[in-house]
Amino acid sequence: MALSDIIQRRDWENPQSVNIHCLKAHSPLASYRDINHARDGIHAQRQSLNGQWKFKLFDAPEQVEGEFIDVQFNDSAWGDITVPSNWQLQGYDKPIYANVKYPFEVNPPYVPADNPTGCYRTRLTLTEADLESTQRIIFDGVNSAFHLWCNGDWVGYSQDSRLPAEFDLSQYLTAGENTLAVMVIRWSDGSYLEDQDMWWLSGIFRDVTLLSKPKQCIEDVFITPDLDACYRDGSLSIVTHISAPETSQVHVQLFDGSQAVTEPSIARPHNRRIDERGSYDDVVFQTLHVREPQQWTAETPNLYRVVVSLLDAEGNHLESEAYQVGFRKVEVKDGQLQLNGKPLLIRGVNRHEHHPELGHVMTEEDMVRDICLMKQYNFNAVRTAHYPNHPRWYELCDQYGLYVCDEANIETHGMIPMNRLSADPQWAHAYMSRYTQMVMRDKNHPSIIIWSLGNESGHGSSHNAMYAWSKQFDPSRPVQYEGGGANTTATDIICPMYARVNTTVEDEAVPKWPIKQWISLPNEQRPLILCEYAHAMGNSLGNFNEYWDAFREFPRLQGGFIWDWVDQGLSQWDNDGKHFWAYGGDFGDTINDRQFCINGLIFPDRTPHPTLEEVKFCQRMITVALTQQDKQQCHLTVTNEYVFRSTDNEQLHWSVLENGVEVQSGQCTLAIDAGSQQTVDIALDFQPKADAKYHLNTDICLISATPWAQAGHVSATEQFTLSNTSSLTLPKISILSAPQLSEQGRDILVSNLDKKHQWQWNVESGLLTSWMVDGQSQLLHAPEDNFFRAPLDNDIGVSEIDNIDPNAWVCRWDAAGIGRWERECVSCTSESLSQAVKVTSTFAYHHNGGVQAITVWTYTLDNQGEMHIDVDVTLADHLPPMPRIGLELALPLPSDNTTVTWQGLGPFENYPDRLAAARFGQHTQSLDAMHTPYIFPTDSGLRSGTQWLNVGNLECTGDFLFSVSRFSQQQLTEAKHTNELTLEDKIYLRIDHQHMGVGGDDSWSPSVHEEFQLTDNTYRFSIMLKPRHN
């Protein structure tokens, strides 16, 4: 078929044209020519066609050179491109990021005339011996649609960018050199079904493979594991589809490594009568029974290998296929999702396939790294948001142990209403094809415990059809789907998005009750697992611990999948060579959703966000409780929340801290069965000091390395405050003379007797303009009131320049002028006391002709160089909740000491509604490490519960929260990327009395819980500052 005929057909604008001449979907095939090879997974008859292909991008399909499909076509002037890759990241076209919006006019099934089209050419050489077998080409992923030619002949067409397209090339190939030509179209009718929250990228982005199979071969294998009613003995139901005479035989055997577990089972077609018309002549049904197999779970990923062989009528071996299998049984029973008869608690995360340099291309190394990180941070489940992943991903989840919710490549979020296509019979074939082909490909993986019909496509007749087919074809797994309200008849699991723990999310169309209420609705017996929750956009995840308190309290609340795993930033460099992570709009894509793709728990390079520590803590598998304490010992109860394994590889390490410094430590081995407890007694062997604070830390550590973590890895932590029964000591009272007080013009001068410490206030500004110690300045900027924070993503919400949300925190703060108030010094007075000098400054803050706040600063200075600051704050009644109440000053940047040491909560960033994982102690970090480089710059680096702080040349004492940074709040507010920030030669020290929470139930509504909002009208706080090495 000529290219002009293909153009005229316009398959890419026809929802009925899904796959033309593609082979039926099936489980992955390898075609081993020996049973032992199949058992060992070696010498598969698969040849990778990855590598350098010739490439040229055209503006539209109509502009493609018609001769490019010909063998003789001269492609020497074309460029080279790596396969697999996304062409936008190879120097062609531009990436587009959109969350909801389609990046083209919505008129299904039609797509823009401006439709970039990438043409690929490559060559492969085959021998006469090769041609004796059938040769199949497999494209594991092409976005979004493509036509294929071989030696100038049209082979076929496919769309669905996340599933394989497989063609039989046998009739087109010749001995010697062969030419393949592929025309990939960026926009197709399939794009309407792929409106996921990710980058729109194009090209051949997954592997291309040539599979050689004998003419008589195995076409598909479906293996269904099961356990008996006692969950003890196992069975494997094996259904094999063959392309061979009905006299052929299928030989099946199960192996554990090289050891055969079962005797061979041999059967022929027609061995099961299907209905009154008879049986299949190309399908063989077999069952293997195994006594007490080692069961597969994410905690104990025990795998066996099934080898399925095709024999001719005389018993001669023709071909083998092999699959890793796990004995496990998934059920929704007694209102819970159960595995092997026990309820699960899903510690899950949504994961996009994203690489900062390669886009949607994932290497095995990338996949293993993600899985190891997930396991290290106590995840046990992953949702393939929102499409089937690379085939290798599932094999690795089988091997390392992760539960998988496998999701169909269907999302129509940008349609109005969302279910417009879901309810349209013209699109039913496309829906069914995407779902059934996913199930057919992935059906043998034990890690997949839930099928998902897709994401955010409303609820329509196509969902009911997919659900019905799934329950008939694979009743061994539950189905979930959130669209249409999370509890429709097309889901076995209530799976809402962003439902809160205790409050209702108002929505006229679909219910979003609090999760506690949802499971108590009349006649509702399904489990609830949040398909998305805890929106981790930037500095977020406030109140995450509340979800986990609820999950542990209510058995039918069985966890959820956090949104989401990785920031989808793309590596870019500015004109000065500074690296930054790009997001929507950075490539000239005018239809975009800006940084809404930056909502992961880890940075694009897989560096964890601080929020991941909170997740790790809340999701810990082993918990410790302090049940009793007396003078001699502490009594601990250690609970093993693993469902299927004992603590045979864990030790408990403990330490006692005195004012944050370790004074005693020890360890003990844990021997706790799954779901059980152990009591641990710790003898206290130290003499408590009066007025000291004592804490007990516990760490759960791995004894031996696992495939996903090194020996010594800390999987769980706790901290307990110990009571101190020692008598209080009387404070030492020193009789000191007061510093010298004088006035010079409009300045107030204070100095101690030896002139070592000198302070100066300007009466007109009311500010401390100078603080000298031994002739060296302590300050670069005077301490000032600080009510503002550089807005977080959660503060901004959906507000944009052209789409203002008046309810967003940033808009409410802006309307109140917070951050722009004009300061007026009402008065600045001083007086000399018997042992100190007191300076009092009163400030009024004006905006729009009214006073918004009044603050009174009282400085008390003694002869030892200590400066005590008491601040009284009064706010106007009409103000919104404030971002923070505190002060800010700037210190000189020391040349020899850029570390920060504090006693308080840490060591990582923590905020008032996200500090469950933080521990009290003495912590030291570099100055640079105190700043979190969020891709979209915001306030960061806060540490709470602080008693004292050493930074630069200053020591601070009190009860406060703080952050230090070399970036001003103005820089952090104005910058849109990290490369726009310039390190300043000073240290900004922000000391807060109170700081608003970060929120995180979602990122588009004001989600900071009321108890973490600053709603009072008056505040009072104190801080003591003095020079270090005083």
Curated annotation (Swiss-Prot):
GO biological process annotation, one example: lactose catabolic process
Chain residues that bind Na(+): D197, F596, N599
Active site positions: E456 (proton donor), E532 (nucleophile)
Positions of Mg(2+) 1 binding: E411, H413, E456
Domain of life: Bacteria
Entry EC number(s): 3.2.1.23
Record-listed substrate binding positions: N99, D197, E456, E532, Y533, A534, H535, N599, W1004
Pfam families the record matches: Bgal_small_N, Glyco_hydro_2, Glyco_hydro_2_C, Glyco_hydro_2_N, LacZ_4
NCBIfam families given in the database record: PRK09525.1 (NF007074)
Secreted listed as a keyword: no
Cofactor(s) listed in the protein's UniProt record: Mg(2+); Na(+)
SUPFAM superfamilies: (Trans)glycosidases (SSF51445), beta-Galactosidase/glucuronidase domain (SSF49303), Galactose mutarotase-like (SSF74650), Galactose-binding domain-like (SSF49785)
Protein family membership: Belongs to the glycosyl hydrolase 2 family.
Residues under site feature: Transition state stabilizer: H352, H386
Record's subunit section: Homotetramer.
GO MF term list: beta-galactosidase activity; carbohydrate binding; magnesium ion binding
Catalytic activity: Hydrolysis of terminal non-reducing beta-D-galactose residues in beta-D-galactosides
Record key words, sorted: Glycosidase, Hydrolase, Magnesium, Metal-binding, Sodium
Gene name in the database record: lacZ
Cofactor remark: Binds 2 magnesium ions per monomer.
Entry-linked PROSITE patterns: GLYCOSYL_HYDROL_F2_2
Protein name: Beta-galactosidase
GO cellular component: beta-galactosidase complex
Binding site for Mg(2+) 2: N592
